[in-house]
Structure formats: structure tokens, C-alpha cells
């Protein structure tokens, strides 16, 4: 009796958090990641992000037991992972990894049904409850219409859906997914992550998934863990994680190239002195700025209010941004700075459709451009293709 109690004490070390790691080091001949500390809550979706080769897959393999830790402990619902029997673990934890199985003579339904193995009896016969679970997983992953097709004939995206359906079919309390959105088109990526979010919330499942699509991770994840340089670089909520400083440190880029409002990186800004001045606001200049960047034309932008969509993008792409406090009429200082910048340019792009009380003074820039005999265009497309609204076309 005492031996059994002691054994239980060794296995049950702390309250039953769905999935945790304590001082985890993982790798092969040598550690790839070290000192990993993770606590994941039920009913949440955690995104694992980081550069290629940083150790995301290594962490996931260690969390599910497919790679033995070099040091530290993985804990599943309060029990050490190493102490759990394979079948018991499979009833609690399901995994989708990046391997690409190619079973012969099996239908898509057969592959999904394999997820019920931990719950079936000795002969592997499916009950009505098992078949209901299979059908629900097929529906969740939108593959009911292809479930009778040979798995080997499916596209990569269809196989991806089927393998995730197999993991869901296990009805786990912990779901580990390595790059679940790979091979999926944009619409399917959105559907998949929305489904996983609902699954976490409605069933109380703890889900952790590695994602390279940062814009999707920012929108879908309750919690974000960033992996870099041999360990956890930072972790926290999406709001805390997706900052310019964190993204710059994580991926080794210019901080201004990451746009937290869009959750995306921008291409490198053109170099050199500004040759075009853009007057924009409220998103009216987004396409014009991107067009100038694609053509490698340096530009200045203003006068933009703090927090405006165009202001956010201009900070990443423009060589100079003249701005003014949000919700306030444009300051005289900003107008003078903008006029000075405009005089050094060869053309003005007037992206605004209209002006109001707070940005009306931008019209001073339009008049100043005409006074300086600078050509004025309604868009970047017109600048490159003509005709100009005023003046003569510049040479770039």
C-alpha cells in the first residue's frame, strides 16, 4: 500500500494543468532548446512562432513524447509524460505533425477512423458513438464530400484536413499541431483556425500549434510563445507578443517593418531622398505607398495623424513621415515641415478623396505644390502611367 502511495506521489507532482513543461531541454545529439517553461490552460489556443530551425517542432515533439527530453519534465494533466502508458496518453493527447503518411488502399474515412483506436476494444470495432465522433470530425474539417476517396489520391491540402480530423476524432483534452495551416489556401487557413478556436472554447481543449502565418497567429491565438536562439524568447497574450520590438528581435529585422495593426511585415523601404510626396489619410494612401515601394521610389508622407492606418504603413515604407497628434487639427509646425519636404520632391500624390475639420490644412500642400509647379496626381498609378492633374510629368 505504501509503495502504491509513493508511486502516485511521484507521478502527481502538481495541480492538473492540461500541459506543462519544467526546465525542458530538447534536441538530438545536443540540445536545440533549453530551459523551456510552459503552462497551457484548458480552453485556449496557443501559437508557437519563431524563425525556421529555432526549435518549434523539437518542442512539440518533446511535449507529445515523440522525442525524449534531454533534461526537464513534461507534465500532462498533472502526470509526468514518461509515466503514462501509450494508450492512456492517446486518450488524453492527440498529435498532428509534419510527416506525410501515404497509406495504400485506405479511404479518407479510414484514416480519420484510426483516431478512434484509443477508445475501441480489443478488436478495434467502432461503436455508434465512435462513428458519430468520426462523422463530426469529418464535418468540422469540411471533408465529408471526399471521405470515401482513396487517401493517396487526395491533394496535399485535403490530406492535411484529413489528418487533423483524425487528431480531433481522438477527442483529446490536449491537441498538439505542427504547422496545421501548411498546404492550405487562405480561405482554408481561416476556416481551420476558426474551427480550432471554437473547438478549444466549446470543448475546453488545450491546443498548441506552430504557425508561420503571423497575421493569423495574431488573430487566432489566446497565448503566444516565441522560440529563438535556443529557448523561449518571450511569451504572453497576442497584444503583448506582437510588438515591433519583439518581432524585430525574433526575426532580426528593422522594427519599423512590422506593422502591429496589420500583423504583417512590410518589404524594405526604398532608399534615398524622397522623390514623391503623398498626402493621405484613413487608408486612402495604402495602395499608392505599396506601388511606390514596389517600384523602388523613395517617398515622404504627410500630414498624417497618429494612429491612422496610413500613418502606420508610412512609418514602415516612407523615408520621411510628417505627423500630428490624433484627433486634433493639423499643427502649423507639421504644415511647415511638410512644405519643406514637398519642395524637395518631384511630384505630389493627392490620395485624399475629401478633407474635414482635422485634416483640412492638407489642402495647403496641394496649393503649395501647384505654386512650386510640381505635378499632382490622384494616385501612384497615374503618376507612372499619366496623365498628371497639374504641371508636367516628372522623370524617375
Task: Show where each model-derived region lies.
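Helix-to-loop junction immediately C-terminal to a conserved catalytic motif
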Residues: 64
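Conserved ABC transporter NBD signature motif
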Residues: 72-80
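Conserved ABC ATPase "signature" region
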Residues: 113, 128-146
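Conserved ABC ATPase signature
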Residues: 125, 150-154, 158
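Conserved catalytic motifs of ABC-family nucleotide-binding domains
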Residues: 171
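Catalytic Walker B motif of ABC-type/P-loop ATPase nucleotide-binding domains
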Residues: 175-179
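ABC ATPase nucleotide-binding domains
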Residues: 252-333, 350-352, 359, 377-396
Amino acid at each position: 500500500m505504501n509503495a502504491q502511495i509513493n508511486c502516485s506521489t511521484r507521478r502527481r507532482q502538481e495541480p492538473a494543468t492540461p500541459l506543462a513543461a519544467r526546465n525542458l531541454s530538447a534536441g538530438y545529439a545536443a540540445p536545440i532548446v533549453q530551459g523551456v517553461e510552459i503552462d497551457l490552460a484548458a480552453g485556449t489556443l496557443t501559437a508557437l512562432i519563431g524563425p525556421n530551425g529555432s526549435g518549434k517542432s523539437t518542442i512539440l515533439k518533446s511535449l507529445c513524447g515523440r522525442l525524449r527530453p534531454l533534461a526537464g519534465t513534461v507534465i500532462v494533466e498533472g502526470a509526468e509524460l514518461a509515466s503514462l502508458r501509450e494508450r492512456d496518453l492517446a486518450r488524453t493527447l492527440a498529435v498532428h505533425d509534419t510527416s506525410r503518411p501515404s497509406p495504400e488502399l485506405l479511404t479518407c474515412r479510414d484514416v480519420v477512423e484510426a483516431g478512434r483506436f484509443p477508445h475501441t476494444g480489443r478488436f478495434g470495432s467502432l461503436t455508434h458513438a465512435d462513428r458519430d465522433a468520426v462523422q463530426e470530425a469529418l464535418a468540422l474539417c469540411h471533408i465529408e464530400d471526399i471521405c470515401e476517396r482513396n487517401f493517396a489520391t487526395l491533394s496535399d491540402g485535403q490530406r492535411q484536413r484529413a489528418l487533423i480530423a483524425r487528431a480531433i476524432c481522438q477527442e483529446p483534452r490536449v491537441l498538439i499541431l505542427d504547422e496545421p495551416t501548411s498546404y492550405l489556401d487562405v480561405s482554408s487557413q481561416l476556416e481551420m483556425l476558426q474551427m480550432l478556436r471554437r473547438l478549444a472554447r466549446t470543448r475546453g481543449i488545450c491546443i498548441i500549434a506552430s504557425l508561420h502565418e503571423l497575421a493569423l497567429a495574431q488573430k487566432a491565438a489566446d497565448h503566444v510563445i516565441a522560440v529563438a536562439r535556443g529557448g523561449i524568447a518571450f511569451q504572453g497574450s497576442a497584444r503583448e507578443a506582437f510588438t515591433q520590438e519583439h518581432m524585430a528581435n525574433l526575426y532580426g529585422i528593422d522594427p519599423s517593418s512590422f506593422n502591429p495593426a496589420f500583423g504583417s511585415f512590410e518589404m524594405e523601404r526604398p532608399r534615398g531622398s524622397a522623390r514623391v510626396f503623398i498626402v493621405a489619410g484613413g487608408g486612402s494612401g495604402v495602395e499608392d505607398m505599396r506601388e511606390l515601394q514596389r517600384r523602388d521610389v523613395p517617398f515622404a508622407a504627410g500630414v498624417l495623424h497618429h494612429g491612422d492606418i496610413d500613418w502606420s504603413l508610412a512609418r514602415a515604407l516612407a523615408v520621411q513621415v510628417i505627423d500630428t497628434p490624433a484627433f486634433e487639427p493639423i499643427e502649423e509646425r507639421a504644415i511647415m515641415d511638410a512644405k519643406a519636404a514637398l519642395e524637395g520632391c518631384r511630384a505630389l500624390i493627392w490620395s485624399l478623396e475629401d478633407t474635414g475639420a482635422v485634416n483640412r490644412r492638407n489642402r495647403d500642400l496641394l496649393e503649395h505644390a501647384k505654386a512650386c509647379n510640381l505635378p499632382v496626381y490622384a494616385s501612384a498609378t497615374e503618376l507612372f502611367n499619366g496623365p498628371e492633374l497639374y504641371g508636367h510629368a516628372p522623370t524617375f
